[in-house]
Structure formats: structure tokens, C-alpha cells
Amino acid sequence: MADVVLGSQWGDEGKGKLVDILCDQIDVCARCQGGNNAGHTIVVGDVKYDFHMLPSGLVNPNCQNLLGSGVVIHVPSFFDELKAIEDKGLNCRDRLFVSSRCHLVFDFHQLTDGLKEQELSTTKKAIGTTGKGIGPTYSTKASRSGIRVHHLVSQEPGAWEEFESRLRRLVGTRQKRYGDFDYDVEEEIKRYKKLADDLRPFVIDAVPFMHKAIKANKRILIEGANALMLDLDFGTYPYVTSSNTGIGGVCTGLGIPPTAIRNIYGVVKAYTTRVGAGPFPTEQLNNVGEHLQEVGAEFGVTTGRRRRCGWLDLVVLQYSTWINGYTSLNITKLDVLDQLEELKVAVGYKHNGKVLESFPEDLHVLEQVECIYETLPGWKSDTTKITEYAELPENAKKYIAFIEKFLDCPVQWVGVGPGRSHMLSKSVN
């Protein structure tokens, strides 16, 4: 059976640390969607590993790792990331696999990502993408003109000529759209001739791989990238990523049935953050927001961008819980709230004097909502040295209990610092 770790807000919740802890007990770790547009750091002993595209299970020497069919891969970045972790002593090539059905991100996708953002910025509608080419790649995938891993590595007669033709055609359509941007497709073809040989040993048919793992009762951990509020269908569209970041994307991205999933862990930051543009009802453009930003070190791993910060939003989390069906939650960064006198939690939205039933799909409404806040007392004490959940200040436990009751979902872990030892386990009935 498979356990799944998903982000419940707008990303950067701290999924990597939970995955890191759970990785000690698993046989297979799989990514199901996204690309190298996410990022987190895992610390093992004194060594820090930065992950963007590769599965975190690589830090476990007994764990097999898969990039599933829903993942999009920039092959040069794949090897750069692999080399960076190998240079730190991690031997993992024989434990890393890539689905033959993954779509490929090329440099021209990244170029057009930037051009699209420039175009949108003139109308003040830029999305604030990472510029990694993820959106344009999913766009070519959806339009059925994309190039998959098997197109690159196939050794069937005529396969390489087909790859060349596909790439030339794909670049040509983008140059018609954006003008003759600086991109030498013939040089790119030469470059990918070698990359095809390098990538081929990693490539497998991921569907039987996952089926056999499930059939053999292997312990499987699936790590979602991004988060529910960035989901293409259920997020704050169009200020979203280009894949399904919820539980649905797990099944479609790996080719597994819902019945193969056991636990769904939702990772929740104790407050709310967001990177890039888009509505953010509980955002605090004041000293509270600055405090959360500075104490929480809210800067992106992938882009280095400063994150927007605000109070915990239970309207968002309720919506996220309804869609993903979390079996339990991991609250992270509780310690960032340690010095605040009082805490506000959004428990509803009002629009034109009317309380909304759920998180609205209309951004014009979302930008105008008035948050209904519940105020809870802070605990004004350092939680970073606490090693047992029972030792938390009473007001901290009341804060967690409030979240559990509102969402009707138990909290299983609470994070009070950056290290593994800072993750407190809480009994779940």
C-alpha cells in the first residue's frame, strides 16, 4: 500500500522534512507530477542535500526511487541535481528510475516561459512562475505535440529521426508564436544525442514497476510537489501550476488505482505563505507579516524569492481537506509563532455582507472577501527545545486542537524547528 504526502496550502509547507522522516521506513519513493519548479533541503547527519526534481528517498540506501509519468523532466537539470548529491557521497544511480512516459522540458520551454511572463506583465497579469519551463511543457503535452522520454531514448529504427523532426517542429511553432528567439535547434539535437545515451539506463515502464511493488506489499511513499491551492483545477486559477497537485494527480501521475492508497498526509504550515502573484485573503502587509517572514526565513529554495506571509486560513484548509481527504496532518513551523501575543485564524469569508459556504472559484470575489477571524492566545515561550508533544505550552496545544476540530482531521506530527529531532509525534485516535 502507498502513503502520500501532499501540500495543503500554496506550497513551501515543509513536505520534505516529513518525507525525510518517513523515508527511513520505505522501499519505494515516487514523485507523481511537477518538475524542478519545487525545492526542499534534507539534512542527513552533517550533510545537506537540495532536492528539486529527484525523489527524497534517494537518501535511504535501501529505497528505490521513481519519477512517475506525470513528472516533466529537464534532462540537463536531472543530471546536475544527481551530480550535486553524488558529489556529497550519495551513491544512488542504481536506485533511480524514470518513467518512459514523462514529458521532456527543453531550454526553449524555459525561454518561452520567460517570454510569456513578460507578455503578461504588460497587462499586470503575470503569474510569477519559476521560469523553469514547466507550464509550457504541460501546455505542449495537453496539445499532444510534446516529446516524451521514450521518444528520446528509443533505439527502434527511425526513432531518432522522429525525435529530431518532433523537436524542430515544436520549436518552429513556438518561434511563430513568440518571434525568432535565440535558440539553435540543431545544436540542441546534438546535445540531446549524448543525453539520450546518458538517460537510457534510468528509463523503465513505470506502470508494471508500481504494480509489482503494490502486489509485493512494498512500503511505498509518494511525494507530491507544490500544493492543493496551486492545482490546475482546484487552485486559484490562473495563479496556479500546470499539473494536478492533489490526490487525483497521484493516481494519474503514477498509473495506480485509488485503492492502492492507504494514508494521505496533509502538510500544513502553522501560518500561511505564498510565492508569486495571486489572491491571498489572510496576507499581512504589516509587522505581523514581516515577523513571520523573518523568523520563518521565508525565502524560496528554488527561486530565492521572498514569500508573502499571513495568518492561518482554515477556509483554505477545509477546502483542501475536502478534496484530498487527509487521514492526518503534519503542522510545521509552530515555533515561528512562539513570540506572538495573540494569533488570528480565518474561519470564514464574507462577501457583500454574506458568509460564503466554501472557498470561491471567482478571483474577483476572492480579492474582495473579508476574513472572519477567531483570535486565540499565544504562548510566548520557546518551543524549539521541546522533545515531546505533551511538553508543548497549553495554548500551543489549544491552537492545534482548534485546527483539528475545525477540519475534523487529526494532527499526527508537529514541527518546532528545522531538524528531524524537532518533529513531535502526536497520538492519533
Swiss-Prot record:
Gene Ontology CC annotations of this record: cytoplasm
Gene Ontology terms, MF aspect: adenylosuccinate synthase activity; GTP binding; magnesium ion binding
Highest taxon listed in the record's lineage: Eukaryota
Quaternary structure annotation from Swiss-Prot or TrEMBL: Homodimer.
Residues binding IMP: D12, E13, G14, K15, N37, A38, G39, H40, T130, R144, N226, T241, R305
Pfam families: Adenylsucc_synt (PF00709)
Needed co-factor(s): Mg(2+)
Entry EC no(s): 6.3.4.4
UniProt-recorded name of the protein: Adenylosuccinate synthetase
Family membership noted in the UniProt record: Belongs to the adenylosuccinate synthetase family.
GO biological process: 'de novo' AMP biosynthetic process; IMP metabolic process
Species in which this protein is naturally found: Yarrowia lipolytica (strain CLIB 122 / E 150)
